[in-house]
C-alpha cells in the first residue's frame, strides 16, 4: 500500500523530523511504499522512501505552505495514496501527528487583535481548523494531554479522534548502550577537563527553547563556579544574538554553539546537566533522551514532557510563571551538590529501565496502517 507523508521541511536534528523518520521507516519496514512530500530535505534519505521535493516560490512561510498544499493535492489526484499522513496541519489528512502546540491557544495567549488581521494568521488558523474541527475524519496522534485539552477548547474535537502516543526514544540514547567509561572518554574527546562542569542544551529554534535563559543562569553563578562551567548548545539556528548576550554577560568563552551534531548521545554521557528552560514546547523529546541517558534535567513546566522529569525525580521543573532567579538558584544548587546530581542520575536510569519511553514509532505505525497491514 502507498502511504504519503507530508511535512514542510526535513532536517536531521529537529524533534518533529526525528519522529517522522522513525515512524516512516517503521511503516516502510512493514512492507508499505512510503512517499514523502517536502519543500526541502537536508541530510540522507532512506532508499526505501520515494522523496518528492515540492516547488514553492513565495517569500513568506505561509505563502510557501499554501503553494505546497495546492501542489500536493494536485499530485495526489494523479498519483493517489492509501493514507495521507501530516506532520504539519493542513486540510485533507487521514492522520495527523501533533508535534506542535495549538495555534489558536497560542494566539489567544500571546497575540493581539491586529495579528488576527494578517494573512499569516488566516492561513495557519484555517489549516489548523481544517485538521481539528468537528466532523472531520482525521485521526489525531497526540503527545500530551495538554495538547488535547487546548484543541478541544477551541474546536470541540470529538474525543474518539485523539490517540495519545508513548514517547519514542532512540534505543542508542540509553545509558546502557554506551561504552564503558563513556563519561571520561567523551569528555576527553570534547576537550572537557574532569573538574569542569558541562551544561548541555539541545534543540533547534534557540529563542523558543530558552537559550537566553540558560546563558543568564550561567552568568549568574558565583565567579569560581562560573569560571569552571561550560555550556554546549546544539541545534539548528542562528546563534549571533545569543553569542552577543553571552558577550554582554561576560561568559562568551564559556558558551559554545554547534549547528547540529550526530553524537548527542555522547554529549549526554559527558554532561552534568541538561538545560531546557523553554518558553514553548509541545512535548520536548530531548527531556526523555536525557532521562534514558541518566542525565539530570532542569526544565520549565510549559514543556509537555516536563511531568516525566517530576515523575522520575531526576531534576527540577520550574513552575509558571517562569522565574529567572529560581532557575539561577536551582542551577547553582545542582552544580554545588554532587550527591544531589548523582541521586537524580540514578533515578533517571531506574525510570529508563522501568517505563515505556520507546514505542512511539510502532504505535504510530499501527494507527497509520490500520486496515492496510496484511
Curated annotation (Swiss-Prot):
Membrane topology term: Peripheral membrane protein
Top enzyme category: transferase
Keyword tags: Cell inner membrane, Cell membrane, Glycosyltransferase, Lipopolysaccharide biosynthesis, Membrane, Transferase
Biotechnology: Identified as a drug target because if its activity could be inhibited, the integrity of the outer membrane would be compromised and the bacterium would be susceptible to antibiotics which are normally prevented from entering the cell. A selection of compounds was studied by molecular dynamics (MD) simulations to identify molecules that can act as inhibitors.
Chain residue ranges for the region called Membrane-interacting region: 103-132
Disrupted-gene phenotype: Deletion mutant synthesizes shorter LPS, truncated immediately after the inner core heptose residues. Mutant cannot produce flagella, demonstrating that flagella assembly in E.coli depends on the length of LPS. Mutation results in a complete lack of phosphate groups on heptose II and in only 40% phosphate substitution at heptose I, which destabilizes the outer membrane. It causes a slight increase in susceptibility to novobiocin and a major increase in susceptibility to SDS.
Gene3D superfamilies documented for this protein: Glycogen Phosphorylase B
Mechanisms controlling activity: Inhibited by divalent metal ions such as Mg(2+), Mn(2+), Ca(2+), Zn(2+), Co(2+), Ni(2+) and Cu(2+).
UniProt pathway annotation: Bacterial outer membrane biogenesis; LPS core biosynthesis
Main function: Glucosyltransferase involved in the biosynthesis of the core oligosaccharide region of lipopolysaccharide (LPS). Catalyzes the addition of the first outer-core glucose from UDP-glucose to the inner-core heptose II. Cannot use other sugar donors, such as UDP-galactose, UDP-glucuronic acid, UDP-galacuronic acid, GDP-mannose, ADP-glucose and GDP-glucose. In the absence of a lipid acceptor, can slowly hydrolyze UDP-glucose.
Protein name: Lipopolysaccharide glucosyltransferase WaaG
Amino acid at each position: 500500500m502507498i502511504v504519503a507523508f507530508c511535512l514542510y521541511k526535513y532536517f536531521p536534528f529537529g524533534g518533529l523530523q526525528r519522529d517522522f523518520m522513525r515512524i516512516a521507516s517503521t511503516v516502510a519496514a512493514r512492507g508499505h511504499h512510503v512517499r514523502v512530500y517536502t519543500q526541502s530535505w537536508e541530510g540522507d534519505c532512506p532508499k526505501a522512501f520515494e522523496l518528492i521535493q515540492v516547488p514553492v516560490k513565495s517569500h513568506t512561510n505561509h505563502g510557501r505552505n499554501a503553494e505546497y498544499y495546492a501542489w500536493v493535492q494536485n499530485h495526489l489526484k494523479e498519483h493517489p495514496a492509501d493514507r495521507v499522513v501530516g506532520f504539519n496541519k493542513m486540510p485533507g489528512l487521514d492522520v495527523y501527528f501533533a508535534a506542535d502546540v495549538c495555534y489558536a491557544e497560542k494566539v489567544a495567549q500571546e497575540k493581539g487583535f491586529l495579528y488576527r488581521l494578517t494573512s499569516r494568521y488566516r492561513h495557519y488558523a484555517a489549516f489548523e481548523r481544517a485538521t481539528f474541527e468537528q466532523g472531520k475524519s482525521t485521526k489525531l496522534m497526540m503527545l500530551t494531554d495538554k495538547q488535547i485539552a487546548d484543541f478541544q477548547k477551541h474546536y470541540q474535537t470529538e474525543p474518539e479522534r485523539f490517540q495519545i502516543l508513548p514517547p519514542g526514544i532512540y534505543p542508542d540514547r540509553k545509558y546502557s548502550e554506551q561504552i564503558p567509561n563513556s563519561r571520561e572518554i567523551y569528555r576527553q574527546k570534547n576537550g572537557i577537563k574532569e573538574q569542569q562542569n558541562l551544561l548541555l542544551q539541545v534543540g533547534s529554534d534557540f529563542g523558543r527553547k530558552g537559550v537566553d535563559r540558560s546563558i543568564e543562569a550561567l552568568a549568574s553563578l558565583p565567579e569560581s563556579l562560573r569560571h569552571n562551567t561550560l555550556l554546549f548548545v546544539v541545534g539548528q539556528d542562528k546563534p549571533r544574538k545569543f553569542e552577543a548576550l553571552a558577550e554582554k554577560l561576560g561568559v562568551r568563552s564559556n558558551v559554545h554553539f554547534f549547528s547540529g551534531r550526530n553524537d548527542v548521545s555522547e554529549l549526554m554521557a559527558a554532561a552534568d546537566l541538561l538545560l531546557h528552560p523553554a518558553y514553548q514546547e509541545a512535548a520536548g523529546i530531548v527531556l526523555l533522551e536525557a532521562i534514558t541517558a541518566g542525565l539530570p534535567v532542569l526544565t520549565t513546566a510549559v514543556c509537555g514532557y516536563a511531568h516525566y522529569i517530576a515523575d522520575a525525580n531526576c531534576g527540577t521543573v520550574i513552575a509558571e510563571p517562569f522565574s529567572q532567579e529560581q532557575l539561577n538558584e536551582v542551577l547553582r544548587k545542582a552544580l554545588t551538590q554532587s550527591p544531589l546530581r548523582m541521586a537524580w542520575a540514578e533515578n533517571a536510569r531506574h525510570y529508563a529501565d522501568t517505563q515505556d519511553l520507546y514505542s512511539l514509532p510502532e504505535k504510530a505505525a499501527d494507527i497509520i496502517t490500520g486496515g492496510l497491514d496484511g
